[in-house]
Design a protein with these regions (language model features):
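Non-heme Fe(II)/2-oxoglutarate
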Residues: 2-93, 120, 127, 132-162
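Catalytic core of non-heme Fe(II) oxygenases with the double-stranded beta-helix
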Residues: 86-203, 207-226
Length: 226
């Protein structure tokens, strides 16, 4: 677990999540999609998603990173990958097991087999500073995990609340007891060509896009440190 001093240092740089609309041209989106679809290095996690890891310096996202640095400062990229998913992510953070000085996460929507108006990224008010995790309050059954630990009670989650989330219509894939103690800060629109920027240690999840008859979406995630 991180020390209080380490957490305080991370918190100094926290800012509200934002969406940079129309950050990528349609030709850039297509270029990124073509790279993913033509690659033979895609991996499939035991939890379902397909990923393709990419690196700064490969020339794939270097121009995007450069533009992000002009707005968010001189961060370092600790990991970046394409994701190709057919089910909505549950509540998680985007930490690293080495517990670095985590900074922003950036999500770049590239494609979905439906209307991107029906997809969002849910930002919760809560943070977790103690490693990569998925949040399943109240669960006792064991489940497969690729990298994250499962947090089954929210004692070490910051900013929990006794209030209930009143409108859960967009997160119907999440069990009610998982949401106990959590509150929604904002739902960011998952618009193709935009960039979603948020603190990587903030709890977040997808909306239930499968309920909107969308069963695949592709994008890029970039995780950073300072």
């Amino acid at each position: 677990m991180r020390t209080i001093q380490q957490i305080t240092e991370i918190q100094k740089h926290e800012t509200p999540p934002v969406v940079i609309s129309n950050a990528l041209t349609s030709s850039k989106v297509q270029l990124l999609l073509n790279y993913y679809r033509n690659s033979d290095k895609t991996l499939e996690k035991n939890t379902g998603p397909k990923v393709l890891y990419i690196n700064e310096g490969d020339g794939i996202i270097d121009d995007i990173i450069a533009k992000l640095r002009t707005r968010f400062g001189d961060f370092k990229v600790r990991s970046a990958h394409y994701f190709d998913v057919n089910s909505p992510h549950i509540i998680h953070n985007d930490d690293d097991k080495d517990l670095p000085k985590c900074y922003k996460a950036f999500t770049i929507p590239l494609w979905c087999n439906g209307d991107d108006d029906d997809i969002g990224l849910v930002m919760y008010d809560q943070f977790y500073y103690h490693g990569p995790a998925k949040f399943i309050n109240g669960e006792t059954q064991q489940s497969s995990v690729h990298y994250n630990q499962f947090v089954r009670e929210y004692r070490n989650v910051d900013y929990t609340t006794s209030d209930l989330i009143e409108d859960t219509s967009q997160i119907t894939h999440l069990r009610e007891h998982w949401l106990k103690g959590l509150s929604v800060y904002k739902i960011l629109p998952w618009k193709i060509g935009s960039i979603l920027a948020f603190e990587s240690l903030r709890l977040h999840s997808s909306t239930d896009f499968v309920s909107k008859e969308i069963d695949q979406k592709i994008g890029i995630s970039i995780f950073t440190t300072i």
